[in-house]
Regions:
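Short, conserved turn/kink motifs that form compact alpha/beta structural patches or helix kinks used as
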Residues: 2-17, 28, 37-40, 47-156
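Short, Lys/Arg-enriched N-terminal segments with co-localized hydrophobic residues
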Residues: 21-22
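Short, solvent-exposed beta-strand/turn "edge" segments of beta-rich domains on protein surfaces
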Residues: 33-35
Length: 156
């Protein structure tokens, strides 16, 4: 998979998304391109569960690139109760910070943005499928930074 080239910061959809998040479209696009081109970014596929039927098959959103930047570190001003609520009985070691960018060009029908609840499937170095869940995300001019919760259950 190779990311699509999209260097038009004036695309109407891009301008609308950046305006809604109060972001500079050019800076945000540069950050997006940096993630897509980063040598350590991994190819992945995103899936979105059906909000109305959790037993239904997830919708395949498409290809993306994920750039893991490290273990998730909760803000230093969080108290113990906030940390417990955020991790919700999950092992904090399973939470990672990562930038996620859709491989499709902005403005195309294939373009999407990762959202809380999406599933991220990537391949490990040994060829195993690794699943993560988008637990949280925030968009800034540095990109779409997501907190991913690794699914530690084997797929097969």
């Amino acid at each position: 998979m190779s990311p699509q080239e999209d260097s038009n910061p004036h695309d109407p959809l891009w301008l609308q998304m950046c305006a809604a998040a109060d972001l500079d479209p050019l800076r945000r696009l540069q950050a997006r391109q940096a993630v897509l081109r980063h040598p350590q970014a991994q190819d992945c596929t995103l899936y979105r569960p059906d909000e109305d039927d959790y037993e239904a098959e997830e919708e395949e959103l498409g290809d993306a690139r994920v750039l893991f930047v490290g273990a998730f570190e909760p803000p230093s001003d969080w108290d113990e109760a906030e940390r417990l609520a955020y991790f919700d009985d999950c092992d904090p070691a399973l939470f990672f910070s990562a930038y996620v960018e859709c491989a499709a060009a902005v403005g195309t029908a294939a373009f999407f943005m990762a959202e809380i609840g999406d599933h991220v499937a990537s391949m490990t170095a040994d060829g195993q499928v690794q699943m993560h869940f988008v637990h949280d995300c925030s968009e800034s001019e540095q990109g779409l930074l997501c907190v991913l919760l690794r699914d530690d259950q084997p797929l097969f």
